[in-house]
């Protein structure tokens, strides 16, 4: 073998070893000829631009030669955090060439993502709001701080939102449409419902937060993974230009088969400082089989019923971080009025809304919110499911602190029934003072909790300072926080 031939073969072997690969999507519903391409970490913008030009060139050549795939090519480009990539329609020859490029980390077939909720019935009383500000099920009042999420923006990555619904009070706006159907409205109802739970005046948790509609699912409640990633990318860029990613929340009441690309995109948004609440899924199976629920850095939410049991449909397992009300949840519907839906899709916006509420109240970053909600929650959920490491049901902290902070009573709406004012709590009898023993000083008074959301004896103790001092970075805490429960 000649030396030049040997060198040529060796270089080819090195190139193949460093090239990306096409991932298998298992049982996920793939979209024919549609692919997501993720570049390797460290790829420069210049390299990315050259790669895209090269892809367009070989794609045009292959399509012209074979006469395939009209209107194909790159459809979405991703560039936020350390993630660079794109998605589009490509023939087999082109995608093989792309996967062989050493700059490519992996190529993933595009799949269909769907909503995690279903319509059950109209006009039934909602209970979720009252449950998250009470220690016990069956209460009727929702107690919350008057800050109510003010200054926080929540991105509804869903089927769209009826931004003109009166319950949003002008705080809803249209962001973008990744479906490209020319229909910038919610033709399904799912997105409007989840948005109402997050920020609605009547049905919402963060009643003063803003919501931005990011349409990634069609009127049937489904859409491509590539469009979901593009939606996350858009949210991160929009937030960075409008108030900052540290004051932004993304709710994703959707999911599909396991996707490395989608999980990677979600992780990049968290790294940017955003809080991501994600539905665990409605298949009564391990949530690790679904994306983006299987991504470690997001806050994955299971659903609970009115008796605090895990909802029968809710996914479970180590990926689940928290539970929230998800059965028979009443919220807004397109065109006005309300409707009831069930699903982890309904649980996730409770967490997204509460995340916005806590971010506004305490000024914490998005990456710290999931752990904070674990601290505030109650260990209430029965039958959390096999391998689930938590039984925590979310709580806004009011019940734990006797409602001592500035708060507003409210009752979840009931059709044709006026709101019920909050009943004042019974005053407690003061305990009899104890006489000190002879020769002993009088005991000091017990410390009184001042901050309604701090589960420690007094406000002088700062958990974040303590953690950083003795255990290192927020990254360490975020990575291993899910094992505290």
Curated annotation (Swiss-Prot):
Q: Which InterPro entries does the UniProt entry name for this protein?
A: PCSK9_ProteinaseK-like, Peptidase_S8/S53_dom, Peptidase_S8/S53_dom_sf, Peptidase_S8_Ser-AS, Peptidase_S8_subtilisin-like, Peptidase_S8_subtilisin-rel, S8pro/Inhibitor_I9, S8pro/Inhibitor_I9_sf
Keyword Isomerase included in the entry's annotation: no
- What is its subcellular localisation? Secreted
* Gene Ontology molecular-function annotations: serine-type endopeptidase activity
Give residue ranges for domain Peptidase S8: 126-400
Sequence ranges of Low complexity compositional bias: 419-428
User: What is the name of the protein in this document?
Assistant: Subtilisin-like protease 1
* Protein species of origin: Arthroderma otae (Microsporum canis)
